[in-house]
Amino acid sequence: MPSHRSALDNSAVAVVIPVKAFHQAKERLSDLLTPAERIVLAKYCADRVINAARNFDIFVVCDDPDVAQWARDHKTKIVWQPEIGLNAAVREGVKFAATQNKQLAIVSHSDLPLATEFEHLINDQSAETLLSSVTLVPDRHEDGTNVMVVPTNFDFDFSYGKNSFAAHQKMAKKYGLSVRILHDSSLAVDIDTADDLAVAQQLEN
């Protein structure tokens, strides 16, 4: 029976997860959830992402002591990057992964409540394909980029925010990297609005 594993060993792959301070997370849900409930939600989502990444070395990029302690409790590596913004934080996380001999980085948002695993993003792909391409997993609106897979030897200019899905495709082509797009319902739902939360609860049930 043929193997479904990637030709690139998991030890060469990092999962990079930028994590915002839990007490600052999900402020757009303040009309629906109390501050304590928002912290619980943020930690629940982040725990799901960490568990989904369990078969890889995990690098949590953060600038908050509570998040750093949470990351230690999960036995992840910590990339401390105070107050530099999401795009720069991801860039530094990927750079640090490269210094740890990681050839590939799976970059994931921390607010994916339905995440179960990341292996399928690289399975059945040759090392040559993975190291010469960018894999994008868009959100359910095909506007944002919830997860992406990038080679660590490119100084990729991350462009998270509105229309990042399109922006990351353009950036990949600028670097001469091919683009793989994977639609995945378990990774497409991130929690920014009450509607997102309702969709996640419906799909979870």
Name each model feature, range by range:
Residues 40-57:
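A short, N-terminal amphipathic alpha-helix
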Residues 115-142:
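Conserved donor-nucleotide/metal-binding helix-loop-beta segment in metal-dependent transferases, i.e.
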Residues 29-37:
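Short glycine-enriched, charge-decorated loop/helix-capping segments at active-site entrances
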Residues 72-106, 185:
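Short phosphate-binding loop-to-helix
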